[in-house]
Amino acid sequence: MIQQARRVAAGLLCALLFLFCPTTLAGCGKVSAPASASAVLSAVCADPDVTGRDVPDTCAIYTRTADTESADYLSDTLFSALFGEAARGLLSGSDPAPAAINDAAVCISVSPTPFEIAVLRLSDVRGTATAAGICRTRLDAVQNAWRGTEQEAVANAGAVTVEGSYVLLVIAPNPERVLRAARAAIRAGGS
């Protein structure tokens, strides 16, 4: 009687494993690739909670994925002009060191208002301190440029944050709202 109960229990266990194991394993295979920096920036700019409130209508967007001949291409020269001398070589790397930042996208207001979003995606989280440092330098420069103006509070509200292998720089009227949209886009991945 006990042996028969054990056989029935083992049979039920095998049936349950047979039914649920493929479903569980299929779910494991749905790990999406990391979102590109331009995909994160596009998602932020398209987010209805951000658009119209925090993103001005007149923005210039520069991405690493744009055609190298395009005016929208985020070149090493433009990147180091924006983020300072410490940023030189971080996008392109140098022999034999690979690029520390393997993808980047920047949105800058072309109207006279302090607004900027930078999304930097790194190949290794160990480089986030360096990337956050250049973003902090950029934020300090923007804050100094707007000191004593009516937009000083917006510049001073800017934030630099690290989200896994991403570093985000946000200068906006409500940086937390922009960061929430960026975090959601990062979590969604490249799907």
Model-derived features: positions:
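Extracytoplasmic/secreted envelope proteins and their assembly/folding machinery
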Residues: 38-41, 117-119, 128, 132-136, ...
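Short, compositionally biased low-complexity segments enriched in polar/charged residues
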Residues: 59-114, 126-127, 155
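Short Gly/Thr-rich strand-loop-strand
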Residues: 125-163
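A short, solvent-exposed beta-edge/loop patch
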Residues: 109-111, 121, 151-191
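Bacterial N-terminal signal peptides that target proteins for export
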Residues: 2-13
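Bacterial N-terminal signal peptides
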Residues: 11-24
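Post-signal peptide N-terminal segment of mature Sec-exported envelope proteins
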Residues: 35-52
